[in-house]
A protein has these predicted regions:
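A short glycine-rich, Lys/Arg-flanked "PGG" loop and its adjoining helix->strand segment in the class I
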Residues: 164-181
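Short, glycine-/aromatic-enriched active-site segment of Class I SAM-dependent methyltransferases
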Residues: 186-202
Length: 266
């Protein structure tokens, strides 16, 4: 019996935009073969076998729903603004910004070849690959993007780095009035000793991780204006949080500590 890789079969049968998109659908558990969920892209599929996709998400990444939740919760204007998507990856956050009327989005990531083509082809998107945001300055970002002006909205979903290391460079490329909507990932804030099997299980460590980010931002002139739990868990099931920083709308982190405790269960 001839067989085809599942990711290739999903794309060939018109159930995904591309093989890359198919692989993501498979990894996220949306694809079934003869009614059984399969999460391995290389799984062999015969021509006579049924392949279906459940609950197809129109967003290029599930992370898009994290930003949607934040923008629904916080009174942050997207329409008409120049935005930076820090750690754009496949472009889920960028996609949300485009849908909400951003005039231009600089989609920056340290990696290469990750941005979904459906996002990258939008004329409002400026893709910046191989860009380490930890060392961003107005000059380096302008040189890499060709956009010679400060952004007035920053969103971020960064992995394998503490937000404390990138807050200052992110602030440097933004206007004083800019809004910052950032995803706090405790698994990258607490250090290796606080992570077991990829998960931050200690609620006090989660609370410390969130509070430390709030204080780090405040020390750089960014008070906290909003804070919510992410509606979707992160990798390995980690609980994550979304914060809104704004110089005019925000307040001292001490006013948010009860909220931190409530959210993290500490």
């Amino acid at each position: 019996m001839d067989s085809t890789r599942l990711d290739a079969a999903v794309a060939a049968r018109g159930l995904a935009r591309s093989r890359t998109h198919a692989a993501r659908l498979i990894a996220n558990g949306y694809v079934r073969v003869d009614g059984t969920p399969v999460v391995k892209a290389s799984f062999p599929v015969g021509d006579e076998q049924s392949v279906t996709v459940d609950g197809v998400d129109r967003y290029v990444s599930r992370g898009a729903h994290k930003l949607i939740a934040a923008l629904d919760a916080f009174p942050v204007t997207v329409e008409g603004r120049l935005a930076l998507d820090a750690g754009a990856s496949t472009g889920g956050f960028t996609q949300v910004l485009l849908e909400r009327g951003a005039t231009r989005v600089i989609a920056a990531d340290v990696g290469h070849g990750q941005l979904d083509p459906i996002i990258g082809k939008d004329p409002r998107v400026v893709e910046v690959e191989g860009f380490n945001l930890r060392f961003a300055t107005p000059e380096t970002l302008a040189g890499a993007s060709g956009v010679d002006q400060l952004v007035d909205l920053v969103v971020a979903d960064l992995s394998f780095i503490s937000l404390g290391l990138v807050l200052e460079p992110l602030i440097s490329v933004a206007t004083p009035e800019a809004d910052f909507v950032l995803l706090i990932k405790p698994q990258f804030e607490v250090g290796r000793t606080g992570v077991r099997e990829g998960i931050v299980r200690d609620k006090d460590l989660r609370a410390d991780a969130v509070a430390n980010v709030l204080w780090a931002a405040y020390d750089l002139g960014l008070p906290t204006a909003g804070l919510i739990p992410s509606p979707i868990a992160g990798g390995a099931g980690n609980l994550e949080y979304l914060v809104w920083f704004n110089r005019d709308a925000g307040s001292n982190p001490t006013e948010w500590l009860d909220r931190v405790t409530e959210m993290t269960g500490a």
